Curated annotation (Swiss-Prot):
It is an enzyme of class 7 (translocase). The lineage of its organism: Bacteria, Pseudomonadati, Pseudomonadota, Betaproteobacteria, Burkholderiales. NDH-1 is composed of 14 different subunits. Subunits NuoB, C, D, E, F, and G constitute the peripheral sector of the complex. NDH-1 shuttles electrons from NADH, via FMN and iron-sulfur (Fe-S) centers, to quinones in the respiratory chain. The immediate electron acceptor for the enzyme in this species is believed to be ubiquinone. Couples the redox reaction to proton translocation (for every two electrons transferred, four hydrogen ions are translocated across the cytoplasmic membrane), and thus conserves the redox energy in a proton gradient. It comes from Paracidovorax citrulli (strain AAC00-1). The gene is nuoD. Its main location: membrane. This is NADH-quinone oxidoreductase subunit D. It comes from the Bacteria. One of its GO terms (molecular function) is NADH:ubiquinone reductase (non-electrogenic) activity. GO terms for cellular component: plasma membrane. Its EC number is 7.1.1.-.
């Protein structure tokens, strides 16, 4: 009788569940995965090399395009590394704004993850639900920076500008009558902080809706329970961070263990899993959304009560205000010099890490005293997570490999860099 051999299957890079450009070479025995070999590099854009030829401030927009669903969290790590080298202090109001927008970014990321992961596993309904809330979060980005995604809002020493007093309004159009527009603009009459405050009150009910759709859903549990189990010891040895590590039961969160900016001034809990399977990681991320909402609410209350500067008063680093730049020649020259020549950073090296929605996102910066980085190294959380795929998928079915890729929350912008 003929012996049946294992065969290879190419999964991606055009597969809808490959989350971008993942090429996975699977070695299969029937339908069971024996080996999974991820091939990366299809989205390599040489970000680290490009940063060596741009001034510190010119490299900032590249950070938005690394993990392009967690834009401001990437900027956060980059700004912290520069501030460490410069030895400058960030005003407290700017710290709170950064924390608030980092958590808004976490919601954006987790909603994107939940919608696409649910869709991969066969629940297309959840995708529509999560994108409904993302729309409001994008409006917050737009109000503060003018861009809905790649904001470049965080700056070394603080943030680009203070929070606006008004929100962008929906305009009348052929598809919506005046009454519909009025309903849409109902919670946009006040300032940005009022809009965010309104969102924080509505959002817990939205999370309840997601949980109604998935948490006790029989099919969802069949697709995620006991799939891709990682023990706490293996999770540490494999270099997992963020929800992947917390899903295995280890309460490690940089916001608590190594607080940066105003994280030591806000209250929140660290959700952890028990089993370390895909279902636990789902529960951890859903609970994280509730905690992020709690942090945002605390930031809104503090920011409403405490006006103040939003960028450092060190004028070698901070640009002049737009009002003064448009009325004084000296400020215009200052602005021009700062954005063309940049500022010089003292010789040395610094590593700054943030609790990114996907894990520990770190920037290692080496300066030789010039206005450009001598070397910039990006520590992407997804890179270590993708390397664990072989171990997690072995012995599971092909369909489970899709659920495991989904649970990792992979974005190739940061992995290929």
């Amino acid at each position: 009788m003929a012996e049946i051999k294992n065969y290879s299957l190419n999964f991606g890079p055009q597969h809808p569940a490959a989350h971008g450009v993942l090429r996975l070479v699977l070695e299969l025995d029937g339908e069971v995965v024996q080996r999974a070999d991820p091939h990366i590099g299809l989205l390599h854009r040489a970000t680290e090399k490009l940063a060596e030829h741009k001034t510190f401030i010119q490299s900032l927009p590249y950070m938005d395009r690394l993990d392009y669903v967690s834009m401001m969290c990437n900027e956060h790590a980059y700004c912290l590394a520069i501030e460490k080298l410069l030895g400058i202090d960030v005003p407290l109001r700017a710290q709170y704004i950064r924390v608030m927008f980092s958590e808004i970014t976490r919601l954006l990321n987790h909603l994107m993850w939940l919608g696409s992961h649910g869709n991969d596993c066969g629940s297309s309904t959840i995708l529509i639900y999560t994108f409904r809330e993302r729309e409001d979060l994008f409006d917050m980005y737009e109000a503060v920076s003018g861009a809905r995604m790649h904001a470049a809002y965080f700056r070394p020493g603080g943030v680009y500008r203070d929070l606006p007093d008004s929100m962008p309004q929906y305009q009348a159009s052929k598809v919506r009558n005046a009454k519909a527009i009025e309903v849409l603009n109902q919670n946009r009459q006040g300032s940005l902080l009022d809009f965010i405050d309104d969102f924080t009150q509505r959002f817990p009910k939205c999370v309840d809706e997601y949980e109604t759709l998935l948490t006790d859903n029989r099919i969802w549990k069949q697709r995620t329970v006991d799939i891709g189990i990682v023990t706490p010891e293996r999770a540490l040895n494999l270099g997992m961070t963020g929800p992947m590590l917390r899903g295995s039961g280890i309460a490690w969160d940089l916001r608590k263990k190594q607080p940066y900016d105003a994280y030591d001034r806000v209250e929140f809990d660290i959700p952890v899993g028990k089993t370390g399977d895909c279902y636990d990681r789902y529960l951890v991320r859903v609970q994280e959304m509730r905690q992020s909402n709690r942090i945002i609410k605390q930031c809104v209350d503090w920011l409403k009560a405490n006006p103040g500067p939003v960028i450092t008063d060190n004028h070698k680093v901070a640009p002049p205000s737009r009002e003064s730049m448009k009325s004084n020649m000296e400020e215009l020259i200052h602005h021009f010099k700062l954005f063309t020549e940049g500022f010089r950073v003292p010789e040395g090296e610094a590593y700054a890490a943030v609790e990114h929605p996907k894990g520990e996102f770190g920037i290692y910066l080496v300066s030789d005293g010039a206005n450009k980085p001598y070397r910039l190294k990006i520590r992407a959380p997804g890179f270590a997570h993708l390397a664990t795929l072989d171990e997690m998928a072995r012995g599971h079915m092909i369909a489970d490999a899709v659920a495991i890729i989904g649970t990792m929350d992979i974005v190739f912008g940061e992995i290929d860099r």
